[in-house]
Amino acid sequence: MGGDHGHSHGDEGGSFYVHLIAGAAAGFAEHCGMYPIDTIKTHIQAIKPGAMQTSSLQITKHIIQQHGITGLFRGLTAVAAGAAPSHAVHFSIYELLKFKFIGSDEDHHPIKVGIAGAIATMTSEAVASPMDVVKQRLQLQITDYKGLTDCTKRIWVKEGIRGFYSGYTTTLVMNVPYNIVYFASYESLKKIIQPWFNNKNPEERSYQLIDHLVAGGGAGMLAAAFTNPFDVVKTRLQTQSDFIASSTINSAKSIKRYGGMMDAMKTIWIEEGMDGYLRGMKPRMVFHSMSSAIVWSVYEYFKFILGE
């Protein structure tokens, strides 16, 4: 992550708060900037088997026709509420563990970096999962929901605390390997890319935007492709409901059709084959490539200006 400006972890307390602030800023910028693509991806993955197949463009047109341009941003409040704290936790713990495992930014151990990212994920997802569930319910234009507060209240009343953690196990199963690939790829790509775009001595360099854009984008794309099947399962689990109907394309009365992660994986394979696991893969790769470029650029920038 931040080896570009020769920072030291001598003041671990100060560094920890820098990472909290930088992580929060990066998470907010990433999710707000990429939200429309995430909405489209969620619609694609939530389409029921046997329903008419639709493209990203068709879904985009349908959402705008039915709900206006704001339909692409429905649920954004939930993301804004959850992204900043979850990313703050994620990056601060990641940096702390990376330092404990490796010690110096000059050393490079992809496996240790990946493990640090995976452990950080387990903590941050506990913060992010409830808002992720609310976000996806709102993204699918569930007409019974009047907004963030109403959606949150009704999930609590109808489904209890378990409703906010629907797909949580799948999220962890997906995000642990995702973040192993993601963080290891980012750090590795950054080491490779730095000599290409910079002629200065690495010890004298400050913030270099191109490093983080390219390394972040590449890492996000690789990790997204690797874990797409788990993301499909997670989306199906989080968006199923036994008490409301959806107004999306191919709308149909929703029922709880998946008993859990393993049942969802089995059912998708039987009913849809490999194509089911690959739903939304292209927009997801685009989304994670662009969002990762944003998050790393903003994160490293805030670390730099905060003196890290």
Curated annotation (Swiss-Prot):
TM region positions: 13-29, 69-89, 111-131, 168-184, 213-233, 285-302
Pfam families xrefs: Mito_carr
Keyword Transmembrane helix: yes
Gene3D superfamilies to which the protein is assigned, alphabetical: Mitochondrial carrier domain
UniProt superkingdom: Eukaryota
GO biological process, one term: iron import into the mitochondrion
Location in the cell: Mitochondrion inner membrane
GO MF entry, a single one: iron ion transmembrane transporter activity
Solcar repeat coordinates: 14-100, 108-192, 207-305
Gene Ontology cellular component terms for the protein in this record: mitochondrial inner membrane; mitochondrial membrane; mitochondrion
Keywords: Membrane, Mitochondrion, Mitochondrion inner membrane, Repeat, Transmembrane, Transmembrane helix, Transport
Keyword DNA-binding carried by entry: no
Signal peptide (from-to): none
Membrane topology: Multi-pass membrane protein
Family the entry assigns: Belongs to the mitochondrial carrier (TC 2.A.29) family.
Role: Mitochondrial solute carriers shuttle metabolites, nucleotides, and cofactors through the mitochondrial inner membrane. Mitochondrial iron transporter that mediates iron uptake. Probably required for heme synthesis of hemoproteins and Fe-S cluster assembly.
The protein's name: Mitoferrin
Species of provenance: Dictyostelium discoideum
Lineage: Eukaryota, Amoebozoa, Evosea, Eumycetozoa, Dictyostelia
